Amino acid sequence: MSKVKKNDETLSEVLVDVNRVTKVVKGGRRFAFSAYVVVGDKAGRVGAGHGKAKEVNEARGKAKQAAKKRMMKVPLYQNRTIHHDVVGKSGAAKVILRRAKAGTGIIAGGSMRAIFDSLGVHDIVAKSIGSTNVYAMISATFDALNKLASPKSIAMRRDKKVNEIFVKSSDIQVNE
Protein backbone atom coordinates (compact mmCIF):
# COMPACT_ATOMS: atom_id res chain seq x y z
CA MET A 1 0.00 0.00 0.00
CA SER A 2 1.55 3.30 -1.07
CA LYS A 3 1.23 6.53 0.81
CA VAL A 4 -0.72 9.30 -0.88
CA LYS A 5 1.35 12.46 -1.28
CA LYS A 6 -0.42 15.43 0.30
CA ASN A 7 -0.13 18.69 -1.59
CA ASP A 8 0.83 21.45 0.87
CA GLU A 9 -0.47 24.25 -1.38
CA THR A 10 -4.08 23.04 -1.13
CA LEU A 11 -4.09 22.69 2.66
CA SER A 12 -5.46 25.49 4.82
CA GLU A 13 -3.87 25.94 8.23
CA VAL A 14 -5.53 27.46 11.31
CA LEU A 15 -3.57 28.13 14.49
CA VAL A 16 -6.04 27.27 17.25
CA ASP A 17 -3.97 27.71 20.39
CA VAL A 18 -0.51 28.92 21.48
CA ASN A 19 0.76 28.58 25.06
CA ARG A 20 4.00 29.46 26.76
CA VAL A 21 5.07 26.46 28.81
CA THR A 22 7.75 26.23 31.46
CA LYS A 23 10.04 23.42 32.54
CA VAL A 24 11.61 23.93 35.94
CA VAL A 25 15.20 22.65 36.09
CA LYS A 26 17.96 22.85 38.71
CA GLY A 27 19.33 26.09 37.24
CA GLY A 28 15.96 27.86 36.91
CA ARG A 29 13.18 27.82 34.34
CA ARG A 30 13.25 26.82 30.66
CA PHE A 31 10.57 28.45 28.52
CA ALA A 32 9.09 26.96 25.37
CA PHE A 33 5.96 27.36 23.25
CA SER A 34 3.19 24.89 22.59
CA ALA A 35 0.99 25.21 19.48
CA TYR A 36 -2.18 23.45 18.30
CA VAL A 37 -2.98 23.58 14.58
CA VAL A 38 -5.88 22.36 12.42
CA VAL A 39 -5.23 21.67 8.72
CA GLY A 40 -7.68 20.71 5.99
CA ASP A 41 -8.20 20.73 2.25
CA LYS A 42 -11.72 22.25 2.40
CA ALA A 43 -12.97 19.17 0.53
CA GLY A 44 -13.61 16.60 3.25
CA ARG A 45 -10.16 15.98 4.79
CA VAL A 46 -9.06 17.45 8.11
CA GLY A 47 -6.46 16.86 10.83
CA ALA A 48 -5.22 18.40 14.08
CA GLY A 49 -1.78 18.36 15.63
CA HIS A 50 0.23 19.60 18.59
CA GLY A 51 3.82 20.85 18.55
CA LYS A 52 6.25 22.20 21.11
CA ALA A 53 9.50 24.14 20.57
CA LYS A 54 11.55 27.06 21.86
CA GLU A 55 10.15 29.40 19.18
CA VAL A 56 6.51 29.90 18.15
CA ASN A 57 7.20 29.33 14.44
CA GLU A 58 9.01 26.05 15.12
CA ALA A 59 6.16 24.87 17.36
CA ARG A 60 3.66 25.81 14.66
CA GLY A 61 5.65 23.90 12.04
CA LYS A 62 5.82 20.79 14.24
CA ALA A 63 2.08 21.04 14.92
CA LYS A 64 1.33 21.33 11.19
CA GLN A 65 3.42 18.22 10.45
CA ALA A 66 1.60 16.31 13.21
CA ALA A 67 -1.77 17.48 11.86
CA LYS A 68 -0.89 16.32 8.33
CA LYS A 69 0.01 12.88 9.70
CA ARG A 70 -3.35 12.63 11.50
CA MET A 71 -5.56 13.73 8.59
CA MET A 72 -8.82 11.88 8.11
CA LYS A 73 -11.51 11.74 5.43
CA VAL A 74 -15.02 12.79 6.48
CA PRO A 75 -18.09 11.97 4.36
CA LEU A 76 -20.02 15.15 3.53
CA TYR A 77 -23.59 15.51 2.28
CA GLN A 78 -23.67 17.60 -0.93
CA ASN A 79 -20.17 18.86 0.02
CA ARG A 80 -21.72 21.30 2.50
CA THR A 81 -22.91 19.50 5.68
CA ILE A 82 -22.81 16.15 7.50
CA HIS A 83 -25.08 13.18 6.71
CA HIS A 84 -26.62 12.77 10.17
CA ASP A 85 -26.55 14.14 13.71
CA VAL A 86 -23.81 12.77 15.94
CA VAL A 87 -22.40 13.15 19.47
CA GLY A 88 -18.69 13.01 20.35
CA LYS A 89 -17.01 12.78 23.74
CA SER A 90 -13.51 13.28 25.08
CA GLY A 91 -13.01 13.42 28.82
CA ALA A 92 -15.38 16.02 30.26
CA ALA A 93 -16.04 17.57 26.84
CA LYS A 94 -19.08 16.59 24.80
CA VAL A 95 -20.06 18.01 21.41
CA ILE A 96 -23.28 17.62 19.46
CA LEU A 97 -23.07 18.06 15.68
CA ARG A 98 -26.30 18.55 13.74
CA ARG A 99 -26.77 18.79 10.00
CA ALA A 100 -28.28 22.03 8.73
CA LYS A 101 -30.18 23.36 5.73
CA ALA A 102 -28.38 25.22 2.97
CA GLY A 103 -27.67 28.82 3.92
CA THR A 104 -27.53 28.20 7.68
CA GLY A 105 -23.78 28.73 7.93
CA ILE A 106 -21.40 27.43 10.57
CA ILE A 107 -22.98 27.86 13.98
CA ALA A 108 -20.24 26.60 16.27
CA GLY A 109 -18.22 27.94 19.13
CA GLY A 110 -14.54 28.14 19.83
CA SER A 111 -12.15 25.78 18.16
CA MET A 112 -14.89 23.74 16.44
CA ARG A 113 -15.32 26.51 13.86
CA ALA A 114 -11.69 26.10 12.74
CA ILE A 115 -12.27 22.38 12.13
CA PHE A 116 -15.40 22.96 10.06
CA ASP A 117 -13.76 25.74 8.02
CA SER A 118 -10.78 23.52 7.23
CA LEU A 119 -13.06 20.57 6.48
CA GLY A 120 -15.09 22.50 3.92
CA VAL A 121 -18.42 22.33 5.77
CA HIS A 122 -20.67 25.31 5.00
CA ASP A 123 -23.82 24.46 6.99
CA ILE A 124 -23.69 22.89 10.46
CA VAL A 125 -24.93 23.49 13.98
CA ALA A 126 -22.56 22.43 16.77
CA LYS A 127 -22.98 22.67 20.53
CA SER A 128 -20.31 22.02 23.14
CA ILE A 129 -21.36 20.75 26.56
CA GLY A 130 -19.11 20.43 29.59
CA SER A 131 -15.44 21.31 29.32
CA THR A 132 -14.48 24.16 27.00
CA ASN A 133 -10.80 23.21 27.02
CA VAL A 134 -9.48 23.61 23.45
CA TYR A 135 -7.74 20.23 23.36
CA ALA A 136 -10.74 18.35 24.78
CA MET A 137 -13.21 20.10 22.45
CA ILE A 138 -11.15 19.34 19.33
CA SER A 139 -10.69 15.74 20.45
CA ALA A 140 -14.46 15.39 21.05
CA THR A 141 -15.19 16.94 17.64
CA PHE A 142 -12.86 14.45 15.94
CA ASP A 143 -14.55 11.64 17.89
CA ALA A 144 -17.90 12.78 16.49
CA LEU A 145 -16.51 13.10 12.95
CA ASN A 146 -15.12 9.54 13.21
CA LYS A 147 -18.65 8.28 13.95
CA LEU A 148 -20.07 9.76 10.73
CA ALA A 149 -21.01 7.35 7.97
CA SER A 150 -22.34 7.94 4.48
CA PRO A 151 -25.42 6.03 3.26
CA LYS A 152 -23.16 4.25 0.78
CA SER A 153 -20.86 2.90 3.51
CA ILE A 154 -23.85 1.83 5.65
CA ALA A 155 -25.37 0.01 2.67
CA MET A 156 -22.07 -1.79 1.99
CA ARG A 157 -21.84 -2.89 5.64
CA ARG A 158 -25.39 -4.29 5.54
CA ASP A 159 -25.02 -5.84 2.06
CA LYS A 160 -27.92 -3.76 0.75
CA LYS A 161 -28.49 -1.09 -1.86
CA VAL A 162 -28.49 2.60 -0.90
CA ASN A 163 -32.21 3.05 -1.68
CA GLU A 164 -33.05 0.15 0.71
CA ILE A 165 -31.43 2.03 3.60
CA PHE A 166 -33.85 4.97 3.54
CA VAL A 167 -37.35 4.37 4.91
CA LYS A 168 -40.22 6.29 3.33
CA SER A 169 -42.75 7.80 5.73
CA SER A 170 -45.56 6.00 3.83
CA ASP A 171 -43.92 2.62 4.60
CA ILE A 172 -43.93 3.13 8.37
CA GLN A 173 -46.62 1.13 10.14
CA VAL A 174 -48.07 2.41 13.39
CA ASN A 175 -49.56 -0.07 15.86
CA GLU A 176 -52.75 1.36 17.32
From Swiss-Prot:
Give the Pfam families listed for this entry.
Ribosomal_S5, Ribosomal_S5_C
Which GO cellular component terms are attached? small ribosomal subunit
Name one molecular function that GO assigns to this entry: rRNA binding
Where in this chain does the record put each S5 DRBM domain?
11-74
Organism's domain of life? Bacteria
> What are the BP-aspect GO terms?
translation
Mind listing the UniProt keywords for this protein, alphabetically?
Ribonucleoprotein, Ribosomal protein, RNA-binding, rRNA-binding
Function of the protein: With S4 and S12 plays an important role in translational accuracy.
Q: What family does the entry list?
A: Belongs to the universal ribosomal protein uS5 family.
Q: How does it assemble?
A: Part of the 30S ribosomal subunit. Contacts proteins S4 and S8.
Share the domain note from the entry.
The N-terminal domain interacts with the head of the 30S subunit; the C-terminal domain interacts with the body and contacts protein S4. The interaction surface between S4 and S5 is involved in control of translational fidelity.
HAMAP family from the xrefs?
A: Ribosomal_uS5_B (MF_01307_B)
Return the protein name. Small ribosomal subunit protein uS5
Species of origin:
Rickettsia massiliae (strain Mtu5)
Q: What is the lineage of its organism?
A: Bacteria, Pseudomonadati, Pseudomonadota, Alphaproteobacteria, Rickettsiales
Q: Which gene encodes it?
A: rpsE
